[in-house]
Regions:
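Short beta-strand or tight-loop elements
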Residues: 22
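Anionic, Ser/Thr-rich low-complexity intrinsically disordered regions
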Residues: 69-86
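Acidic, low-complexity, intrinsically disordered interaction modules
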Residues: 25-68
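Negatively charged, low-complexity tracts enriched in Asp/Glu with abundant Ser/Thr
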Residues: 1-19
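Intrinsic disorder/low-complexity signature
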Residues: 26, 36, 82-83, 91
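Short intrinsically disordered terminal tails
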Residues: 1-2, 89-95
């Protein structure tokens, strides 16, 4: 399983530790206008510009095995590890 968090374009974090399962990515059906699905480890955006929580849910629910394998492969790259490290440094200095 891959963790995601969902955030709006204004950067407000809505859901943390979202797993790719047949579950919803809105919090209790409360959906803001536009969503971004982001890999929670590195901060890489997986998909941007989904207009509703329902669209967001459908996108995640229908991620193909190939897409999941591609994300898992990306997580093994040096670029990915650097992004994770950069995100952790940013969190330490901004949160």
């Amino acid at each position: 399983m891959i963790d995601f968090y969902i955030r709006t374009h204004s950067g407000i974090q809505i859901v943390t530790g979202y797993k790719i399962t047949k579950s919803y990515c809105c919090h209790k059906d409360t959906c803001l206008a536009r969503w971004t699905i982001t890999d929670s480890k590195s901060g890489f955006a997986i998909q941007k510009g989904l207009k509703t929580g329902k669209e967001c849910f459908e996108y995640v629910k229908n991620l193909s095995d190939d897409m999941i394998k591609a994300i898992e492969k990306e997580r093994k790259t040096e670029r990915y590890q650097k992004a994770c490290d950069d995100l952790e440094k940013w969190k330490e200095s901004n949160l």
